[in-house]
């Protein structure tokens, strides 16, 4: 149950599960940290976002959400793939360890090595996202 006036931290297994309750919340989503899930979250009006780094990948492909969301003005971070299961938002929230974050998240106190829970709580301070992401 949502508490009026309190920013909610919502774990989801996939960005495809985004619903109307996502707006203004901090989401911890078990999806890869690429532009697709980031765009869906931005369109949903998420306050801040934590995704899975899925092992980072070649040329940092698993982190492309971070600069994308930085440009839009949304704090975001990724958890280390070795710390929590992919596609399991609750596991990420409980056991996840931050591997990377964008400058906006860093400015709120988020840093590599921090627990996902602590990072999510810090991101509750973020200004609600009100941008209009480009669908391209």
Named regions from a protein language model:
Residues 1-135:
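Residues that scaffold, gate, or flank divalent-cation-dependent active/transport sites
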